[in-house]
Amino acid sequence: MVEEVQKHSVHTLVFRSLKRTHDMFVADNGKPVPLDEESHKRKMAIKLRNEYGPVLHMPTSKENLKEKGPQNAPDSYPHKQYPANQGQDVEYLVTGTHPYPPGPGVALTADTKIQRMPSESAAQSLAVALPSQTRVDANRTAPAGSEYRHPGASDRSQPTAMNSMIMETSNTKNSALMAKKAPTMPKPQWHPPWKLYRVISGHLGWVRCIAVEPGNQWFVTGSADRTIKIWDLASGKLKLSLTGHISTVRGVIVSTRSPYLFSCGEDKQVKCWDLEYNKVIRHYHGHLSAVYGLDLHPTIDVLVTCSRDSTARIWDVRTKASVHTLSGHTNAVATVRCQAAEPQIITGSHDTTIRLWDLVAGKTRVTLTNHKKSVRAVVLHPLHYTFASGSPDNIKQWKFPDGGFIQNLSGHNAIINTLAVNTDGVLVSGADNGTMHLWDWRTGYNFQRVHAAVQPGSLDSESGIFACAFDRSESRLLTAEADKTIKVYREDETATEETHPVSWKPEIIKRKRF
């Protein structure tokens, strides 16, 4: 016969379970865990050994030293030994130095060099041997290196050598605590101002790019009139015109390793010109939109281009093969630069980011997101392991290899199209409103501002600098402008520090804005 189980509500079952649990544990509910005497003794002995181990074995008396043998030097001052625990409150006396001197200048003697690991019995005896609280408080106020004695004991002065050592140590500490001189802001290096030397006309459209050849004999420009022109650097006369692009030429560069000129344009084409025959010998196909810039690797035969299709491409110069497609930017890539050291490729984009790339893997190493607006220009310092980027909000300086932020160069409130720097530390920024600012690279001091007049035949609104470059001697600065001209600037040879002083006021607390 099956016994019928009485059904209860969930509420009743829960409370029954709670009651059973309460009845099971109510005997010791809320009581502390019972203390295990044996483990407590071991714990205290270990704690005393660890915390007071260095002072457990004090210098021994004369008699004990004599028993140990003649190799231990006798102590001229008697010491007391800690007795075993006899159940009475005994005050103990420390009259000599211990293995770890209480302060600087306390010399080690033969007996203080004796160090042994404390035993458990010694650790237990230390519980009674520790000084009283009154003595501890008195010891805290006593100077380092002094001795502690019972009242009425004969005074013994410190040795003269010890006193001198203590005084020297205290003087050293005081000198370390002296107020240091406030750091001074570095003063900008004086640079002579640059003045307009020559205006070269010949293009029929905006001059968008410029490059100087390695021999410093001529330079090349690309224009919106779809031509590439080669000019004599000394006289400014036109030497050669190259036609082949069917849209604006946006980038030109001359190889230092071969007699080749590379160009790119808004017609998606990248061309390699042989300057011995003045003909195109290679095309590099792959970009899906306008190509905005290009650069050559300084040590290997590699060409890097950047495009409006949000990618940068790495090409083998000789085989025309696309080695890598650097994808990751979310908007047009406006500028690209190469260097021999890592990271070997740097790109700036309209998506406001700068990317440092691993050339071998074809992947991003670092992405810099500090800019708030499009990054249209990047320049690498020829000597320092640093670079600068230009954007309408700021010019920013960075450190390689990981893109550490250095400083902002504020004041050029326009769309910055181009940057150039020379070995003297002169940074040039050119903007779309025709203004050119010159900066001291180290301090960020803006020592000159130039706004050249628009040349006849152009509208006043056609006042913009699209590209700039120093020649190889760094004595001339070339700018490619929207008034269809190339302007050549030179340093003012008559300027001195007296005629053009550095008008610089350091900011006491320079605000570090990212």
Swiss-Prot record:
Annotated positions of the Phosphoserine modification: S119, S201, S391
GO cellular component: catalytic step 2 spliceosome; DNA replication factor A complex; nuclear speck; nucleus; Prp19 complex; spliceosomal complex; U2-type catalytic step 2 spliceosome
Segments of this protein annotated with the region Disordered: 56-76, 140-159
Domain of life: Eukaryota
This protein's record includes keyword Transmembrane helix: no
Predominant location: nucleus
Keywords: Acetylation, mRNA processing, mRNA splicing, Nucleus, Phosphoprotein, Repeat, Spliceosome, WD repeat
Residues bearing the modification N-acetylmethionine: M1
Intervals holding WD repeats: 202-241, 244-283, 286-325, 328-367, 370-410, 411-449, 460-499
Localisation: Nucleus; Nucleus speckle
InterPro entries hit by this protein: G-protein_beta_WD-40_rep, Prp46/PLRG1-like, WD40/YVTN_repeat-like_dom_sf, WD40_repeat_CS, WD40_repeat_dom_sf, WD40_rpt
SMART domains: WD40
GO biological process: mRNA splicing, via spliceosome; positive regulation of G1/S transition of mitotic cell cycle; protein localization to nucleus
SUPFAM superfamilies linked to this entry: WD40 repeat-like
Family: Belongs to the WD repeat PRL1/PRL2 family.
Role noted for this protein: Involved in pre-mRNA splicing as component of the spliceosome. Component of the PRP19-CDC5L complex that forms an integral part of the spliceosome and is required for activating pre-mRNA splicing. As a component of the minor spliceosome, involved in the splicing of U12-type introns in pre-mRNAs.
Protein name according to UniProt: Pleiotropic regulator 1
Species of provenance: Rattus norvegicus
